[in-house]
């Protein structure tokens, strides 16, 4: 993926690498627009107006598969269903969120549209 593109396009096969990159170095994405496909996760806190698009990632072996998502502010978040596939286009900002217990990348949705599931529903490195 090209981090200097007007819209950083994250392909299905690049999700795990991008997720690690944006969570380890969020400041380099601050102010950027990103587009990626992911599954909807509902947040236990901040339910109103937020969801967490992301995917299941396997870092080592089957036992360590976990859902990795980013908090996303979206006015119609309540209309989304858990595990539904969507394409998200959003701007990135780095600020406090309880999910991180500190600062981290927060998405603000520009557009959220239904999507077909990824060919591989578990992303790997």
Language model region names:
Residues 1-125:
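OB-fold and OB-like single-stranded nucleic-acid-recognition modules
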């Amino acid at each position: 993926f090209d981090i200097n593109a007007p819209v950083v396009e994250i392909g299905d096969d690049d999700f795990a690498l991008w997720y690690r990159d944006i969570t380890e170095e969020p400041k380099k994405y601050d102010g950027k627009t990103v587009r990626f496909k992911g599954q909807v996760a509902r947040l236990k806190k901040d339910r109103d107006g937020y969801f967490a698009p992301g995917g299941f990632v396997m870092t080592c072996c089957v036992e360590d598969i976990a859902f990795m998502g980013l908090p996303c502010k979206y006015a119609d978040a309540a209309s989304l269903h858990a595990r539904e596939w969507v394409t998200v286009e959003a701007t990135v900002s780095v600020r406090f969120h309880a999910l991180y217990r500190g600062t981290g990348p927060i998405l603000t949705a520009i557009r959220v549209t239904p999507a077909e599931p990824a060919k591989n529903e578990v992303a790997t490195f």
